[in-house]
UniProtKB/Swiss-Prot annotation:
Its EC number is 2.8.2.-. This is Carbohydrate sulfotransferase 10. In myogenic progenitors, it is ubiquitously expressed. It is a single-pass type II membrane protein. GO terms for cellular component: Golgi membrane. Catalyzes the transfer of sulfate from 3'-phosphoadenylyl sulfate (PAPS) to position 3 of terminal glucuronic acid of both protein- and lipid-linked oligosaccharides. Participates in biosynthesis of HNK-1 carbohydrate structure 3-O-sulfo-beta-D-GlcA-(1->3)-beta-D-Gal-(1->4)-D-GlcNAc-R, a sulfated glucuronyl-lactosaminyl residue carried by many neural recognition molecules, which is involved in cell interactions during ontogenetic development and in synaptic plasticity in the adult. May be indirectly involved in synapse plasticity of the hippocampus, via its role in HNK-1 biosynthesis. Pfam families: Sulfotransfer_2 (PF03567). Residues 1-6 are cytoplasmic. 3'-phosphoadenylyl sulfate binds at residues 127-133, 189-197. The gene is Chst10. It comes from Rattus norvegicus. It comes from the Eukaryota. Belongs to the sulfotransferase 2 family.
Length: 356
């Protein structure tokens, strides 16, 4: 009998210790695609069930636009912008697209989002979609310069000098507060045309002299993906396409580090299914979208978007066809499979003229 009481007491003690320990279990978000081994702590302790449910509701509320960002507050909002947000909401619900449309709100994502506290704006950077000009707008709004024309080009991309903090630099509470209450936007363009722009800018022209693209990344891609190893030409678009469409490219991505942001999907950059953005602009309609974004953010009386050269934002099917000429249908289909989420979330037509 005495032994039974001891056994019963021991069981209660184990259960009690397990309950206490569970309160200190940490939950983490990992960087998407393993771009960084570092983990970001989102919740510091586990919570009782009722409190946990409230916490989950709070976290979902953090991601929802409020106030001026709700469509109900803008009965005169042009339908095209509401349709873009609705398209994203519907695509995010598609189970078949889940692996291509969802990502974690990790440090990698938070590093892409620039903050203007003075005017409560968050801008997610999507390289090769005219981001330099939007950075200039935010730099002026933050007060580092009085006009866009005064900003030296080298300062725009020097994030220690341009006065643009990243969302990742704030505390967990600060991040959640800004995600919940600030005006949030980013810009997209046709995914394949964006890849062409990235290839030209980083591997052909390289105007900002970033030697690592030609001297480190290009040789790595050529060694892995060039069919004719005796060919001595520099990297070709075909090599780039094979690399991007390879499901097993992850080890190369890890080697290349954050330099890959110029061709990472919009989903991985900005987490549009997890963060409820206020406006999604399109590069192809930037002449109308830029003034609209400034107006919705309440800053159109303070700054103007730089002049857009005529025709520069138009989709160029001929250019796309020329770049993909001679590339196998298999490689193009694999590339599309990777970027299908970007095509569908943002309403870009499937490029059947390349795939069939």
């Amino acid at each position: 009998m005495h032994h039974q009481w001891l056994l019963l007491a021991a069981c209660f003690w184990v259960i009690f210790m397990f309950m206490v320990a569970s309160k200190f279990i940490t939950l983490t978000f990992k960087d998407p695609d393993g771009y960084s081994a570092k983990q970001e702590f989102v919740f510091l302790t586990a919570m009782p069930e009722a409190e946990k449910l409230r916490g989950e509701k709070h976290f979902s509320e953090v991601m929802k636009p409020t106030g001026k960002m709700l469509s109900e507050s803008h009965p005169d909002q042009p339908p095209v912008y509401l349709e873009r947000l609705e398209l994203i909401r519907n695509a995010c619900k598609e189970e078949a697209l889940r692996n291509l449309s969802h990502t974690e709100v990790s440090k990698f994502v938070l590093d892409r989002i620039f903050v203007c506290d003075k005017h409560k704006i968050l801008f997610c950077q999507t390289p090769k979609v005219g981001n330099t000009q939007w950075k200039k707008v935010l730099i002026v709004l933050n007060g580092a310069f009085s006009s866009i024309e005064e900003i030296p080009e080298n300062v725009v991309h020097d994030h220690e000098k341009n006065g643009l903090p990243r969302l990742s630099s704030f505390s967990k509470i600060g991040i959640q507060k800004r995600l919940k209450t600030y005006f949030k936007f980013f810009i997209v363009r046709d995914p394949f045309e964006r890849l062409i722009s990235a290839f030209k800018d980083k591997f052909v022209h390289n105007p900002r002299f970033e030697p690592w693209y030609r001297h480190e990344i290009a040789p790595g891609i050529i060694r892995k993906y060039r069919k004719n190893r005796t060919e001595t030409r520099g990297i070709q678009f075909e090599d780039f396409v094979r690399y991007l469409g390879d499901p097993n490219r992850r080890w190369l991505d890890l080697q290349f580090g954050d330099h890959i942001i110029h061709w990472v999907t919009y989903v991985k950059l900005c987490a549009p299914c997890e963060i409820k953005y206020s406006v999604i602009g399109h590069h192809e309609t930037l002449e109308a979208d830029a003034p609209y974004i400034l107006k919705e953010a309440g800053i159109d009386h303070l700054v103007s978007y730089p002049t857009i050269p005529p025709g520069i934002t138009m989709y160029n099917r001929t250019k796309v066809e020329q770049y993909f000429l001679g590339i196998s249908k298999r490689d193009i289909r694999r590339l599309y499979a990777r970027f299908e989420g970007d095509f569908k979330l943002f309403g870009y037509q499937k490029p059947d003229f390349l795939l069939n």
